Amino acid sequence: MQWQDHAIILGVKRLGETSVIAEVMTRDRGRHMGLVRSGRSRSMQPVLQPGNLVEVTWRARLHEHLGEFRMEPVRLRAARLMETATAVYGVQAMGALLRLLPERDPHPYLYDALDVILENMQNPMDAGELFVRFELAVLNELGYGLDLGECAATGVRDDLAFVSPKTGRAVCRTAGAPWADKMLALPPFLAAGTVEAANGESLAAAFRLTGFFLHRHVYEPRGIEIAAAREGFIQAALKAVNAVSLDRPDNPPVIAAKR
């Protein structure tokens, strides 16, 4: 059996003295593993870095076998991704999110989103918002998508301010006010129909929102912890926002975001 596809490197594991098992995210075949012979060679090590885009050919005798990868570089961006803390942690955290999905299960939307985010991860001001939207997309692909398009109580699409922790649906400010202390805040930049950019406060609220539902629907039922790289990314992203906020008195810095 054989197929060919574009793939993004997620990670590698050493196998013997010269080979590695590579983990990649492909567009048409999802997250996939394969043996790379001579993967530890001087020529292949720069190619097999997380975040790089490659053209991969997979061969195996049977579909269920691990199989062997042959790789050709398409876009080597790992060196650039290592220049900022947000990018370093972001690549690791997004890889951990993709490992929540079944292996070899196609998720073309997530592949495309990952590729776009990696191209823009070097800008810390964009990285936080893109990462939050990626977490929302993963929740949706796992069957736990949030409905942020209209108020669950009234059906209106304006002034959406809360998210119900029970249903994952948006609630407008008027309808949610009596239960505001029990609701999750809906950051304005995530509300349907808005074009507002994220700032420190709204970004911290967004991390709390996605973290809550990831923990409730995914990590807690599976008995696993949220990847440490996520917290590293959050701190790096908020630090970058805080640095910009020092020059903008109307945007007070935000110190941390907790689940």
UniProtKB/Swiss-Prot annotation:
The Gene Ontology biological process terms listed for this entry are: DNA recombination; double-strand break repair
List, alphabetically, the Gene3D superfamilies matched.
Nucleic acid-binding proteins, Recombination protein O, C-terminal domain
Q: Which family does it belong to?
A: Belongs to the RecO family.
- Annotated gene: recO
Give the CC-aspect GO terms.
bacterial nucleoid
| Task of the protein | Involved in DNA repair and RecF pathway recombination.
Q: State the organism of origin.
A: Rhizobium rhizogenes (strain K84 / ATCC BAA-868)
On whether Transmembrane is a keyword of this UniProt record, the answer is no
- Entry keywords, A to Z: DNA damage, DNA recombination, DNA repair
The record's section on InterPro entries has: ARFGAP/RecO (IPR037278), DNA_rep/recomb_RecO_N (IPR022572), NA-bd_OB-fold (IPR012340), RecO (IPR003717), RecO_C (IPR042242)
Read off the SUPFAM superfamilies from this record.
ArfGap/RecO-like zinc finger, Nucleic acid-binding proteins
Name of the protein in question: DNA repair protein RecO
